[in-house]
């Protein structure tokens, strides 16, 4: 092994674990069984540790980038991979604090979720077969709740307001929130998908059907992401030419992971990066499920989307694990739990959540005796309660705050939910 490659490999091993800069450079690098000089490896790990502790992760990142550049200039072929480890982008100690009342917001969220379900069920009782989506909003409720409570800003005399593209299938939840706020009557909620008599609610967001309620149409699926990109670009156009002050306005686009397979959903993402649309924020509800089955049963949709968007020049924020996982991550000094998370595909994660704590203990933690020992003091219920990041308002708030503050790139939040 030549000196340049040896230096690069040993630095990257530590950076992958602690900085989360890269996920895999190649199987060769990640296969520790090929390490023919463990002492040298340990020396480089300790050296990088020292840089991180003394000068911070930014300096360490710079050194790694210089090493990669030097290796490539020397003729080394280093495959590029745009994915990072299957963990939250923002570590716990860097989370921006949630400023609200978690208990009060949880109660409000529960009422909205209940009313969203009842709107669909009561409509189908009155008119069997009329349809309506229940699961989409239930999985995304926290994502919307944190946005409404802390980030979405309405228009006023001095500010044009933020623009929000709501995922079409989540409309029952948006109606339910409006009802709770007193902006919609019970009669209207009871007439979900029944517009012909003049006092009903449209199936999906559409300003022609409900001009005083919806800003943008987002169905058929995939149109919201595409239009959101061009809306954000238009706001930049207005500001750059002095037509209107849109400098602080944000465009939020909510969509599902299955929806991202629509050709329109990712059709203009390179334009958003090229135009540096830092006024644009995508929020993808990654519940791993579409109408007809898993989105990527034998893969990882979050990793795939991260690769697509990061490779196109976006700022990617992954919100995968909730706060109940934090103590386990703190114990994971050897990276074994992260390794297990990398091994599992989305179909397995769905299985773990569906079959409960005992099954998860045996099949997820049980693969490695060391992992199983770490959860020995936890009940099956405790293991079942280990939450996904998209249901944790603290994790979601931190990601949104980072996205709003980010400059020079559009941002995408990939939130894992049930």
Question: Which role fits each region the language model picked out?
Answer:
Residues 37-77:
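Amphipathic alpha-helical packing elements
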Residues 40-43, 47, 63, 78-126:
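Cofactor-/ligand-binding subdomain signature composed of acidic, glycine-rich
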Residues 75-88, 324-326, 415-418:
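Terminal amphipathic helices with adjacent charged low-complexity linkers/tails
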Residues 95-99, 205-214, 249-251, 283-291, ...:
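Gly-rich Lys/Arg/Thr-decorated short loops/hinges at beta-loop-alpha junctions or inter-strand turns
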Residues 100-112, 116-126, 133-275, 298-299:
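Cofactor-binding active-site loop characterized by glycine-rich and histidine/acidic residues
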Residues 164-167, 280-287:
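Short internal beta-strands
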Residues 286-418:
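Long, well-ordered, tryptophan-enriched scaffold segments
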């Amino acid at each position: 092994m030549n000196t340049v490659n040896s230096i690069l490999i040993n630095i990257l091993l530590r950076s992958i674990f602690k900085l989360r800069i890269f996920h895999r450079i190649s199987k060769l690098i990640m296969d520790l069984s090929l390490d023919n000089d463990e002492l040298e490896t340990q020396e480089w790990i300790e050296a990088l540790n020292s840089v991180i502790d003394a000068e911070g992760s930014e300096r360490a990142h710079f050194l790694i980038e210089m090493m990669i550049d030097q290796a490539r200039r020397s003729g080394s072929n280093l495959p590029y991979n745009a994915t990072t480890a299957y963990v939250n982008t923002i570590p716990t100690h860097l989370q921006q604090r949630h400023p609200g009342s978690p208990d009060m917001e949880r109660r409000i969220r529960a009422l909205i979720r209940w009313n969203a379900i009842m709107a669909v069920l009561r409509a189908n009782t009155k008119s069997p077969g009329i349809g309506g989506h229940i699961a989409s909003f239930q999985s995304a409720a926290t994502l919307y709740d944190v946005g409404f409570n802390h980030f979405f800003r309405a228009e006023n005399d001095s500010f044009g307001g933020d623009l929000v593209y709501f995922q079409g299938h989540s409309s029952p939840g948006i109606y339910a929130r409006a009802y709770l706020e007193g902006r919609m009557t019970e009669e209207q909620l009871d007439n979900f998908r029944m517009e012909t008599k003049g006092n009903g609610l449209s199936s999906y967001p559409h300003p022609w059907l409900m001009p005083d309620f919806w800003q943008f149409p987002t169905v058929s699926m995939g149109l919201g992401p595409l239009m959101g990109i061009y809306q954000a670009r238009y706001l930049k156009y207005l500001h750059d030419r002095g037509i209107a002050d849109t400098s602080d306005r944000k465009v939020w686009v909510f969509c599902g992971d299955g929806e991202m397979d629509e050709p329109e959903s990712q059709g203009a993402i390179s334009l958003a990066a090229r135009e540096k649309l830092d006024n644009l924020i995508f929020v993808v509800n990654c519940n791993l499920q579409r109408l007809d089955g898993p989105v990527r049963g034998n893969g990882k949709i979050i990793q795939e989307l991260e690769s697509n968007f990061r490779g196109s020049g976006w700022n990617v924020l992954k919100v995968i694990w909730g706060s109940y996982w934090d103590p386990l991550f703190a114990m994971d000094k050897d990276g074994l739990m992260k390794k297990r998370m990398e091994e599992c595909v989305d179909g397995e994660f769905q299985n773990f959540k569906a079959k409960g704590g005992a099954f998860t203990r045996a099949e997820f933690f049980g693969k490695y005796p060391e992992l199983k020992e770490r959860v020995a003091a936890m009940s099956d219920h405790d293991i079942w309660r280990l939450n996904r990041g998209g249901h944790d308002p603290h994790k979601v708030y931190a990601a949104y705050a980072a996205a709003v503050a980010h400059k020079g790139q559009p941002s995408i939040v990939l939130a894992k939910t049930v």
